[in-house]
Regions:
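Primarily recognizes the serine-hydrolase "nucleophile elbow" in alpha/beta-hydrolase
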Residues: 192-262
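Acidic catalytic loop of the alpha/beta-hydrolase fold
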Residues: 349-358, 384
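Alpha/beta-hydrolase active-site loop
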Residues: 150, 177-199
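Short, surface-exposed "cap/lid" segments of acyl-processing enzymes
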Residues: 95-156
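Catalytic-loop region of hydrolases
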Residues: 43-114
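Short beta-strand/loop motif that positions the catalytic acidic residue
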Residues: 339, 344-348, 352
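Accessory cap/linker subdomain of secreted extracellular hydrolases
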Residues: 242-336
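Secretory targeting and sorting signals
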Residues: 2-45
Length: 411
């Protein structure tokens, strides 16, 4: 597997030790807040505007033009990805506070197949980092490593794939990492963008599945909870979500002082970006100000140099212990809206070193108690290896639901 990553086409050769560390840190997603949202009225597909060349594509017009969530601001036709047409899109979405924003993403449509009735899989990427250069649409090494298997398996089955970059990855601003409402909106709105880009031939009639692991698993789960009120017009059929960080407080206890400290630091920056009143900088000591400044544009492969540190190393007061931070964190706990569509949930077993297993099981139990159609599976391995060992099952689960194969609940 490491050899395969080293030899990805068109990429420089990475040292084996670097790749090993990278894979060990592929991580996380956590939160969001389920708040009532007024859904946008679906718009008919209109002629799309071609976006600017280069990285200027990712900078939206200022002021942001009016638009409903999922409306395409502009797009770019890219080189085909295998046997799929590829489009880069900048689209309207909503942030954690419900305010309009612009998010980038990628849409892949298999060639040689009718788009009529073609399933659309919205893939939430796992953790890639905070820097704009890490965005999934820019094909960073870590994004390709963890997402390409999902993409290939979906395309081989004839499914279109829509993958968001999330808020603040590629686009201006700090990535709102781990903020479930922001990520859930982005995951749903990239499907709308795929349906509204005339070049794809897709529409609201196409069945939709949500897919992701780690940060992507959390994003998919949040999209599932938000969909009934935020995007009710989507023909949602199923969800496959693994390694879900459903309870940030529970996850943070394992990360602070542990192998995944960098992920906790990313979460702190994500919360601060989504909720400016939290004012992370006011809690930082001199070391913390330097650390978070240097850290804020890293990709995940460079984050492996920060294990076993603690927030107390960088703060005068640990913000996670304050009332303001606790209130926002408590808003982020998954489980308030149980999914009504078949949902495949899975986790590393017996121990997940990055996303604590007990809180994932607790979310499953919450959904099951509410009567949700859940299928649960344990995968022997750690957080990183389960990314790869689970991919076939996760995509197959969606395929079976698209094909109306009978579903058996396994709570």
């Amino acid at each position: 597997l490491i050899d395969m990553f080293q030899r990805l086409p068109g990429r420089r050769l990475w040292p084996r030790t670097k790749i090993s560390s990278l894979v060990a840190m592929l991580a996380l997603s956590m939160l969001g807040a389920v708040l009532p949202v007024v859904s946008a009225t679906p718009a008919a597909a209109a002629a799309a505007v071609a976006g600017p060349a280069g990285d200027d594509f990712y900078t939206p017009p200022s002021p942001l033009p009016a638009g409903n969530p999922g409306d395409v601001i502009w797009y770019r036709k890219q080189a085909d990805s295998g046997n799929a047409s590829s489009y880069l899109v900048l689209y309207h979405s909503r942030d954690a506070l419900g305010q309009p924003n612009a998010v980038s993403g990628t849409i892949l449509v298999p060639k040689g197949r009718s788009p009529v009735g073609m399933p659309i899989v919205s893939l939430g990427s796992g953790t890639v980092g905070l820097g704009d250069q890490c965005a999934p649409s820019k094909n960073s090494l870590v994004s390709v490593a963890q997402n390409q298997g999902f993409i290939d398996k979906a395309l081989q089955r004839g499914f279109a794939v829509a993958m968001t970059d999330y808020e603040g990855l590629g686009t201006p601003g700090v990535h709102t990492y781990v903020i479930g409402r922001s990520e859930g909106h982005a995951v749903l709105d990239v499907v709308r963008a795929a349906q509204r880009l005339p070049e794809t031939g897709l529409s609201t009639a196409n069945p939709v599945g949500l897919l992701g692991y780690s940060q992507g698993g959390g994003a998919a789960a949040w999209a599932g909870e938000l969909q009934p009120t935020y995007a009710p017009e989507l023909n949602l059929k199923a969800i496959s979500a693994g390694g879900i960080p459903a309870d940030l407080l529970a996850v943070s206890q394992q990360l602070d002082g542990g192998l995944g400290f960098a992920v906790l630091a990313m979460a702190a920056l994500g919360l601060d970006s989504a909720y400016p009143e939290l004012d992370l900088e006011s809690y930082l000591n001199a070391s913390g100000k330097k650390f978070f400044t240097d850290f804020s544009d890293d990709c995940v492969e460079s984050l492996t140099i920060y294990p076993f540190r603690k927030l107390s190393d960088y703060t005068t007061i640990n913000p996670l212990t304050t009332a303001a931070w606790k209130a926002r964190i408590n808003e982020q706990k998954l489980g308030a809206v149980a999914p009504k569509v078949p949902t495949f949930m899975y986790h590393a077993w017996p121990i997940d070193e990055l996303v604590a297993r007990p809180q994932g099981v607790a979310l499953k139990d919450t959904y099951c108690a509410a009567g949700s159609p859940i299928r649960w599976k344990d995968y022997l391995g750690d957080h990183a290896t389960v990314i790869f060992t689970s991919q076939s099952d996760a995509v197959s689960f969606l395929a079976d639901r698209f094909a109306n194969v009978p579903f058996s609940r396994s709570c």
